Amino acid sequence: MDEKAAPGSETAIFAGGCFWGVQGVFQHVKGVSKAVSGYTGGAKDDAVYETVGTGRTGHAESVEITYDPSKVTYGQLLQVYFSVAHNPTQLNFQGPDSGTQYRSTIFAENDTQKQIAQSYIDQLDKAKLYPAPIVTTIETGKTFYPAENYHQDFLTLNPTYPYIVYNDLPKVANLKQLFPALYSEKPVLVLSASN
């Protein structure tokens, strides 16, 4: 099940650990025009990195992806999300980061996205592609709040930062290897070079 390809733009919001790596992956997907790091699941007043980091806000570090469904479908974005961007079997942690703010969650923008995401998870569960159960949740009706500017484009701007080298650059390499038709060498950036 996937959405019908239509010109224009749609948004998808995925959470899967630290947003630096998730953003970095989706910035390299053809058909994506923007991938913004932020917070989803909690209140606006709590959408601040230091507060979200407590794990008590309901927010997850997330990425809002703007894409052209005639170039890349929601289903293809889900494939990248589950195969490259994070490990969907880890409950409330990814790599070295732990807490509910690092949970694996799809924030569906509408009923169609919710149905596609649930169908995809069901297919993965049935195929038993992972050594452990998928713990990814689907939430609806949540507002996305952009993160602070210093979190935007972090992977691209800090390619030698040890966390990025160890945790996130391999994800971009896996995207290129597993989905060469979707891979774009040049990332779409949130901030201009002057910021």
Swiss-Prot record:
One of its GO terms (molecular function) is peptide-methionine (S)-S-oxide reductase activity. The active site is at residue 18. Its EC number is 1.8.4.11. Keywords: Oxidoreductase. InterPro entries: Met_Sox_Rdtase_MsrA_dom, Met_Sox_Rdtase_MsrA_sf. GO terms for biological process: protein modification process. It catalyses: L-methionyl-[protein] + [thioredoxin]-disulfide + H2O = L-methionyl-(S)-S-oxide-[protein] + [thioredoxin]-dithiol; [thioredoxin]-disulfide + L-methionine + H2O = L-methionine (S)-S-oxide + [thioredoxin]-dithiol. PANTHER family: PEPTIDE METHIONINE SULFOXIDE REDUCTASE, PEPTIDE METHIONINE SULFOXIDE REDUCTASE MSRA 2. Belongs to the MsrA Met sulfoxide reductase family. Has an important function as a repair enzyme for proteins that have been inactivated by oxidation. Catalyzes the reversible oxidation-reduction of methionine sulfoxide in proteins to methionine. This is Peptide methionine sulfoxide reductase MsrA 2. The lineage of its organism: Bacteria, Pseudomonadati, Pseudomonadota, Alphaproteobacteria, Hyphomicrobiales.
